[in-house]
């Protein structure tokens, strides 16, 4: 017996070349079978006129208040996204907001580094960069996002952050811009 059968949906699975109307059976959280006229399940859901496909991955989105919304996790889930990468944080806020939303999204955070507001300078010391990076990755961030396009950083700071992330095998993202080109 299956736990769930999704009946009569348009099943799309690019990896396996599936693009047809049919039934999809789930057992213990895993797809057990794709076919036609499947039955014998604890729950059967009619999906006629609907897509049945793997969850989408959004590699760049924002849950935090700086660029996003407290409703971001719910809105993202409603769009079919099951896995995403928040590219700005702030870490603590995103963790609280997504936990409260109950949307069930798997996500990671690459936290925004803005030394002007965090340290009062666009040219922080190596220790300031290292301490901030460690405190955020220990808190759950996967890496650092430089937001030079919004808050220009000097090239030396950008270099230090990228070098540190490389040494420590952390993600680094860069919203291009520096004090050299005033962007």
Predicted features and spans:
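Histidine-centered catalytic micro-motifs
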Residues: 55-66, 148, 172-179
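Divalent metal-coordination and catalytic microenvironments
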Residues: 9, 24, 29, 49, ...
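Divalent-metal coordination cores built from histidine and acidic residues
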Residues: 47, 69-153, 157, 162-170
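Catalytic core of soluble alpha/beta enzymes
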Residues: 181-183
